[in-house]
Each structure stands twice: as C-alpha cells, then as structure tokens.
C-alpha cells in the first residue's frame, strides 16, 4: 500500500531507533548499523490492484535465479491484490480466493507469509479487536494459520501504548491479550508482558 522508499525508511527506523523525520540526517549512522546485519531485505512496489498472485510468484522466481531465497514474505496487503479472474465474483469470494492463493505461495516457497487486513467500523476505537471486526470477508480468517490484531484507542495513541490480541493460533494458545509499547515516530513496537490476559480480563478492568 505504501511506496517502497517509505517502507524501507520504516525498516531503517525500526532497526536503528532513529526517528523517521531524522533518517536523512543520520544516513551514515544508519548505514553503518545496517551493513553489519546479515541477510538482505528486498522491497518491491506495485501500483494498487496491478499485481496478482502470479505477479508475486514471478518476482520470487526472479529472485531465486539471483540466488536470493526468501526466509519470509510480507504482502502489504492481501485485500489489494488483483483477483486472477478479473473481479467477476463477489468481493468476499475474491478475498477468500486471494488469501488461499497467498497460503499456497507460502507453501511453495516453504516460508512464512504475512499480510495485513482492515477492520470494519466496530474496530475503529475498540479496546480489543476480535476476528468479528475484520472487514469484508470473514472466510479469509479460516485460511490463516495465525491471526493477531493490534488495537489502539485515542488514549493509547497519546501514551504510545496499545494491545495485541492473539485471535487465532492453529498451533498454540489463542484468545490472549498482550500490552504493547508503540512509538510510531521511530517504528518501535515492543510486547510488554510475556503473560497474556483474556478478553474478559480486559473488559472487567475497563468496566
């Protein structure tokens, strides 16, 4: 959804702790820190709704021919991928198919694949965002192995806080809420507690 230079800048900030507004000022410091990190990060941008799953597959194959095998793929974001059938189906069916194809791509590449999705209006200022708040097609939730949500109220945004909710975990516990520190100026996100709370715990505290 964002331009490749903006995405790359956010990674620079997250890795080095330099605020986004100061990235150009501390270019040498950033370069010195990042060059010591093993591995590579490839950021590929496509115009909105121009890329389908085959487009991404072709790019991955091109990288493999250059001896770059991805350990993880992040798609920003699945809902904006162009359907293979030209958009003839209802949107909810399109999204379900897109997410199934993303899962298939992860299996082919033998690596984790992450993407994001939007919430509906009920999740805009919710204390905890559950799967019921995920917009458009609920069926895409059935495809995922792991789903977490990030919620931030107006007060959270002022205090650099938030919550992460484990909405689905095919291979482990779910239904847990963890407090977050979240400073968007430097893209710093930290889970503050190793012991999760349930949604009911959060509701009782806020009532």
Give residue ranges: language-model regions.
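Conserved RecA-like P-loop NTPase ATPase core
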Residues: 1, 43, 76, 102, ...
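Cytosolic-facing regulatory segments adjacent to core modules
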Residues: 2-69, 83, 177-179
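Short, glycine/acidic-enriched loop or turn micro-motifs at the edges of active sites
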Residues: 4, 79, 121
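Amphipathic alpha-helical segments in well-structured domains
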Residues: 4, 95, 99, 134-140
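C-terminal regions of RecA-like/P-loop NTPase motor modules
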Residues: 32, 53-73, 86-89, 107-109, ...
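Generic beta-strand/beta-sheet core signal
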Residues: 44-46, 75-78, 116-117, 150-151, ...
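Helical hairpin unit composed of two closely spaced alpha helices linked by a short loop
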Residues: 71-115
């Amino acid at each position: 959804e964002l331009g490749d230079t903006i995405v790359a800048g956010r990674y620079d900030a997250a890795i080095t702790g330099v605020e986004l507004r100061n990235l150009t000022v501390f270019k040498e410091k950033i370069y010195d820190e990042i060059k010591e990190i093993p591995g590579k990060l490839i950021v590929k941008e496509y115009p909105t709704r121009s890329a389908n799953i085959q487009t991404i597959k072709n790019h991955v194959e091109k990288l493999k021919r250059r001896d770059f095998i991805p350990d993880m793929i992040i798609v920003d974001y699945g809902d904006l991928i162009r359907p293979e059938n030209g958009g003839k189906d209802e949107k909810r069916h399109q999204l379900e198919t897109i997410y199934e194809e993303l899962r298939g791509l992860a299996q082919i590449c033998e690596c984790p694949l992450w993407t994001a999705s939007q919430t509906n209006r009920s999740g805009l200022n919710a204390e905890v965002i559950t799967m019921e708040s995920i917009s458009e097609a609920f069926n895409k939730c059935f495809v995922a192995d792991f789903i977490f949500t990030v919620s931030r109220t107006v007060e959270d945004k002022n205090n650099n806080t938030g919550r992460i909710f484990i909405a689905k975990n095919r291979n482990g516990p779910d239904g847990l809420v963890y407090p977050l520190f979240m400073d968007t100026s430097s893209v710093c996100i930290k889970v503050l507690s190793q012991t999760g709370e349930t949604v009911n715990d959060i509701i009782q505290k806020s009532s």
